[in-house]
UniProtKB/Swiss-Prot annotation:
Similarity remark: Belongs to the MAGUK family.
Single Gene Ontology BP annotation: negative regulation of tumor necrosis factor-mediated signaling pathway
Domain SH3 span(s) in chain numbering: 584-649
Designated name of the protein: Tight junction protein 2
Membrane topology of this protein: Peripheral membrane protein
Domain Guanylate kinase-like: 660-858
Organism encoding this protein: Mus musculus
One GO CC annotation: tight junction
Main location: other
Residues carrying Phosphothreonine: 435, 887, 907, 915
Subunit and partners: Homodimer. Interacts (via PDZ2 domain) with TJP1/ZO1 (via PDZ2 domain). Interacts with UBN1. Interacts with SCRIB. Interacts with OCLN. Interacts with SAFB in the nucleus. Interacts with USP53 (via the C-terminal region). Interacts with claudins, including CLDN1, CLDN2, CLDN3, CLDN5 and CLDN7. Interacts with CLDN18. Interacts (via N-terminus) with CTNNA1.
Disordered, as annotated region: 129-195, 225-286, 381-485, 904-1055, 1095-1167
Modified-residue entries (Phosphotyrosine), positions: 554, 1095
Chain spans, region Interaction with SCRIB: 1165-1167
Length: 1167
């Protein structure tokens, strides 16, 4: 005969970062089995090598996940519970097993194949098997009720043994194997798990702890047998537990497990023995001693346990309902079968009922379970009878005499714990999100190890505590204003603070702050504060919506001896719900600093990550918050609290500032002054700038909320094809996108590139369009700070060659360096990835990036945005006020130069477009340079690299004698006539850059037709501007420059002929430069007048021309000695004109003194 039994296991799985729990589930109410329609959640696959490999098997039925029943649930609900488990999941499963069942014989012992099943510890201490059996054709619900019906028909419950009754009183199952060799007491103390023991042959079987069933077995290699009534050789005798109380003739029958009672009938002999034993007085326990005579003998016991109602309070809902009675056996709790369930698991089920508790009970008319006589542990001399100390169960009468009904808060028997163990319980339960009340479940005795003797005195001590109902307390009446705000049932207490307030708090901003414990003897206790009171206000601080950490800190900061006024309301029902569900704090934050993992429980994170904080006082201690990472994978752990986060953020900000300090500036100056490194100068500057992360105005933790944006969010694109993408969006979708125009800065501004006013962005948004912005990462952070929430998309390139290929295909006329674009993209990805809202991978093989770009923008526009919960410092609610705040000096512009911001741009002379054109950009596009100090001479090598539009190979081919002759010092320094000499001294700076490229451009055929006008004319017009570098030069001047170029080409190739041309051009450049200097001076005066406390215009006295003035540059002036030698080498080709000879002598004398005769005139341009 074959029967299907169900073995139950509890498995704890550690989640793997890559494989998860390593299982797949199927089934559910919405996905029943295709053959039999079963709705159980079934393990459909176990990943080899995963966390569940060897622990779970296919076709296992999931009964419970972390205390949540999985019976008759949706498939999605089961999957969600597994995902919410975090790193650890406790899964209870039941596994079908077929066993051979043989009919029972009279006296011969049953064969091992016909008895039950074998319990093997397969899971390394992480699983247990309850061992209750069910027929495969019945569900667990039906089987439970049928099983009890079988017990009533066959087993006669009124004749069950006292031991069986005690099993049901505790609801715990212990499985022990008794073996001659295995004396080890390896027992598993985790809740809901079975314990197996191997005991010596002399080990005397004894049930110590009343209400705990002990399933003993002789060894793993032997099967369990049935009730002792089936075995005629199970002789009697007195157990050491009862030899002093029980009489040998009064013995009761040992009860059979419900499964065997259901499936088998006792033999005639056992029936007669059963009837014989039933004649004894059922009110007296009997003692039984079982002794092995052979090593392979078995005790033949298989015990079980059951939850029953031990006591009911007078004022509880169960008593008011009238359908429940003390002694009723609970079969189901909210649909979950309670057989072999621990009290701890039963308590969890009840706590998760959330106000609705559904029970299925079996009425015990004789109330056998609650009438068990009181017994004490025997003082037997048999060594190591049991390591389990009993937890005495009092009768209802005894319990009522020792403490009142108010000590109970639920049917799960939350008993007041001892003061010595309060701290331990507080630390254990505070992880649930609230500091616990001083209550503790009787729980698992094997895990807690609490002795019966230690519990009895505690009840007797707490018994005489006066009850608050006996003497009603009259509280102070709050003010009418407080009553109007907090309600009429508010009570007020007032006392002076001692060493501490004496309160332990629970809850948080999500549910309110509650009193979780009161220190005995404190003023708070004397004034009538009670556990479960909600604190609404302390002195002037409103506690509603306050996080628990802030509430504790506020109470701690109250000075000793100061009066404390507390407004509170008694809300015990809400308080119990808080403890049951573990709710407390709940708010969202966004990090603005980096944090590494400190402890195994900590979370590592970077800037821009969002967390949900669920406990601000983790483990009852300050310093850490318990948070859940919001993202693709929910992860729970510890993060620094607000104060520690601010300290860490300030340290990181200081390190960022030190990384870009003035030491790097002087290093750049050294590179600028040394020869042979000009080519890599800009690259070094960008490397230094990229190494410094973008600074931010945000605090370390920004409280955020998920909201929808009610406007078209601005769009910022980064990457090697950002300019092309912006142009396509504005051209192909003009109804949705508009490029924000750049404007020149005011005169005297420090930055060199164009800017975008926020007012321009707002105007585009008011037109219901996306504003396309070409701004820096720092400007993006400013947009986030001002709550414009830009959509920031980064184009991630695959390789440098891919960038070059795609740009040549999309923009053939562009000559931007692919190497620079690729390097800058990598730097942005490394330092500013927290600003990106989306990333699009750019592949040179296809052009699918544009469709992805449009889809990404539309998707992000429709999605909710994490917005700041409170307004930032200096920000107003109204948009107009916010804009007026942003239009203040220094905050109303967004830099349009798409390079990383650094301190070196202020004085770095190697400015230009944000990519290095490397002599490939046409001269028609003027180079936009950074601010340059006028006192710094421009070196000859720099002019060769930056001014000439021709490649290096062409430069070498154009190295003719005329070119060498033109490389001589600028003729603008001609001493005669004196007026020309005094004027030309000021603007020699402009011509030192333009002399050599002039001849080079005129030497190359077709240079002008290709868009390369001679730099002789171009440089005085827009070379090295100081105030408005991005403003183009008026066209009439360009025409004049073109005429001067033609005149220069027809002029004689003598020095005097060239001098006349240069003097004419120098005069025009001087006028323009003087006008710019005057505008700068006016702008500085205007700024200084508006902000006298910030700005001041330096007044410098002019120095006499006599003597050598000090140089303003960090390097000494470089006299043109090498060009002079070149001039002397070629002087033979000019003839022996005495005027030329005299000019050379005066020019040489001028060169010895340096470039500038009056450097003080330029010192006012230093910013």
């Amino acid at each position: 005969m074959e029967e299907v039994i169900w073995e139950q296991y509890t498995v704890t799985l550690q989640k793997d970062s890559k494989r998860g729990f390593g299982i797949a589930v199927s089934g559910g109410r919405d996905n029943p089995h295709f053959e039999n329609g079963e709705t159980s959640i079934v393990i459909s696959d176990v990943l080899p090598g995963g966390p569940a490999d060897g622990l779970l098997q296919e076709n296992d039925r999931v009964v419970m996940v972390n205390g949540t029943p999985m019976e008759d649930v949706l498939h999605s609900f089961a999957v969600q519970q597994l995902r919410k488990s975090g790193k650890i999941a406790a899964i209870v499963v039941k596994r079908p097993r077929k066993v051979q069942v043989a009919p029972l014989q009279g006296s011969p012992p049953l064969s091992h194949d016909d008895r039950g099943f074998e319990v093997i510890e397969e899971f390394d201490g992480r699983s247990f098997r309850s061992g209750y059996s069910e027929r495969s054709r019945h569900s667990s619900h039906d089987m439970l009720s049928h099983s009890w019906e079988g017990n009533r028909e066959r087993g006669r419950p009124h004749q069950r043994t006292q031991s069986r009754e005690r099993e049901r009183s505790r609801g715990r199952s212990l499985e022990r194997g008794l073996d001659q060799e295995d004396y080890g007491r390896s027992r598993e103390r985790s809740r809901g798990r079975s314990l197996e023991r191997g005991l010596d042959r002399d080990f005397v079987s004894r049930d110590h702890s009343r209400g705990r069933s002990i399933d003993r077995d002789y060894d793993r290699d032997y099967e369990r047998s049935y009730h002792e009534a089936y075995e005629p050789d199970y002789g009697g005798g007195y157990s050491p537990s009862y030899d002093r109380r029980a009489h040998p003739e009064t013995r009761y029958e040992r009860s059979r497990s419900r499964e065997h009672l259901r499936s088998r009938s006792p033999s005639p002999e056992s029936r007669s023995r059963h009837e014989h034993k039933g004649q004894h007085d059922p009110d007296r326990p009997i003692g039984v001693l079982l002794t092995k005579s052979k090593a392979n003998e078995e005790y033949g016991l298989r015990l079980g346990s059951q939850i029953f109602i031990k006591e009911m309070t007078r004022t509880g809902l169960a008593t008011k309902d009238g359908n429940l009675h003390e002694g009723d056996i609970i079969l189901k709790i909210n649909g979950t079968v309670t057989e072999n369930m621990s009290l701890t698991d039963a308590r969890k089920l009840i706590e998760k009922s959330r106000g609705k508790l559904q029970l299925v009970v079996l009425r015990d008319s004789k109330q056998t379970l609650i009438n068990i006589p009181a017994l004490n542990d025997s003082d037997s001399e048999v060594e190591d009878i049991s390591e389990i100390e009993s937890n005495r169960s009092f009768s209802p009468e005894e319990r009522r005499q020792q403490y009142s009904d108010q000590d109970y808060h639920s049917s799960t028997e939350k008993l007041k714990e001892r003061p010595s163990s309060r701290e331990e319980t507080s630390g254990r339960l505070s992880r649930m999100g609230a500091t616990p009340t001083p209550f503790k479940s009787t729980g698992d005795i094997t895990a807690a190890g609490v002795t019966e003797a230690s519990r009895e005195p505690r009840y007797q001590e707490e018994g005489p505590v006066p009850q608050p109902r006996t003497a009603p307390r009259v509280f102070l009446r709050p003010s009418p204003e407080d009553e109007a705000i907090y309600g009429p049932n508010t009570k007020m207490v007032r006392f002076k603070k001692g060493d501490s307030v004496g309160l332990r708090l629970a809850g948080g901003n999500d549910v309110g702050i509650f009193v979780a414990g009161i220190q005995e003897g404190t003023s708070a206790e004397q004034e009538g504060l009670q556990e479960g009171d909600q604190i609404l206000k302390v002195n002037t601080q409103d506690f509603r919506g306050l996080v628990r950490e802030d509430a504790v800190l506020y109470l701690l900061e109250i000075p000793k001896g100061e009066t404390v006024t507390i407004l509170a309301q008694s809300r015990a029902d809400v308080y119990r719900d808080i403890l049951a569900c573990g709710r407390g704090d709940s708010f969202f934050i966004r990090s603005h600093f980096e944090c590494e993992k400190e402890t195994p429980q900590s979370l590592a994170f970077t800037r821009g990550e969002v967390f949900r904080v669920v406990d601000t006082l983790y483990d009852g201690k300050l310093g850490h918050w318990l948070a859940v990472r919001i993202g693709n994978e929910l992860e729970k752990g510890l993060i620094p609290n607000k104060s520690r986060a601010e300290q860490m953020a300030s340290v990181q900000n200081a390190q960022r500032e030190n990384a870009g300090d003035r030491a790097d500036f002087w290093r750049m100056r050294g590179q600028r002054s040394s020869g042979g490194v000009k080519k890599n100068l800009r690259k070094s500057r960008e490397d230094l700038a990229a190494a410094v992360s973008v600074s931010t105005k945000f605090p370390a933790y920004e409280k955020v909320l998920l909201r929808e944006a009610g406007f078209k969010r601005p769009v910022v694109l980064f990457g090697p094809i950002a300019d092309i993408a912006m142009e396509r969006l504005a051209t192909e979708l003009p109804d949705l996108f508009q490029t924000a125009k750049t404007e020149p800065k005011d005169a005297g501004s420090e930055k060199s590139s164009g800017v975008v006013r926020l007012n321009t962005v707002r105007q585009i948004i008011e037109q219901d369009k996306h504003a396309l912005l070409d701004v820096t990462p720092k400007a993006v952070d400013l947009l986030n700070y001002t709550q414009w929430f830009p959509i920031v998309i980064f184009f991630n390139p695959d390789s440098r060659q891919g960038v070059k290929t795609i740009r040549q295909r999309l923009s053939p006329t562009s000559n931007k360096s692919s190497r620079k674009l690729f390097d800058q993209a990598n730097k942005l990805k490394k330092t500013c990835s927290h600003l990106f809202t989306a990333t699009i991978n750019v592949n040179s093989a296809n052009d699918g990036w544009f469709g992805s770009l449009k889809d990404s923008i539309q998707q992000q526009q429709n999605e909710a945005v994490w917005v700041s919960e409170g307004k930032m410092e200096g920000m107003d609610d109204d948009a107009e006020d916010r804009m007026s705040y942003l239009t203040a000096m220094g905050a109303d512009y967004l830099s349009c130069d798409s390079r990383l911001i650094s301190d070196f741009e202020d004085t770095d002379g190697e400015g230009g477009a944000y990519t290095d054109n490397e002599l490939e950009e046409p001269a028609e596009e003027p180079l936009v340079s950074s601010i340059t100090r006028s006192s710094e001479p421009v070196q000859h090598e720099e002019n060769i690299r930056k001014s000439s539009p021709e490649p290096r190979a062409q430069m070498r081919r154009a190295a003719s004698r005329d070119q060498l002759r033109d490389a001589s010092p600028p003729p603008a320094f001609k001493p005669e006539p004196p007026k020309a000499r005094s004027q030309n001294r000021e603007d020699s700076f402009d011509y030192s850059k333009s002399n050599l490229p002039a001849t080079a451009g005129s030497e190359i055929p077709g240079g002008s037709t290709k868009g390369y006008p001679p730099p002789i004319a171009a440089k005085p017009a827009f070379g090295r501007p100081i105030l408005k570098p991005s403003t183009p030069v008026p066209m009439p001047e360009s025409e004049e420059v073109g005429e001067s170029t033609e005149e220069q080409e027809d002029a004689p190739r003598s020095v005097l002929g060239r001098v006349k041309i240069f003097e004419k051009m120098d005069h025009k450049a001087k006028l323009q430069r003087m006008q710019e200097l005057q505008e700068a001076q006016n702008a500085r005066i205007e700024i200084a007048q508006k902000h006298p406390d910030i700005y001041a215009v330096p007044i410098k006295a002019p120095k006499p021309d006599a003597g050598l003035p000090p140089h303003m540059s960090s390097r000494p002036p470089e006299p043109q000695k090498a060009p002079s030698r070149l001039y002397q080498d070629t002087r033979g080709s000019y003839g022996s004109d005495p005027e030329e000879e005299e000019y050379r002598q005066q020019l040489a004398a001028h060169s010895k003194r340096g470039y500038y005769s009056q450097p003080s005139r330029y010192r006012d341009t230093e910013l």
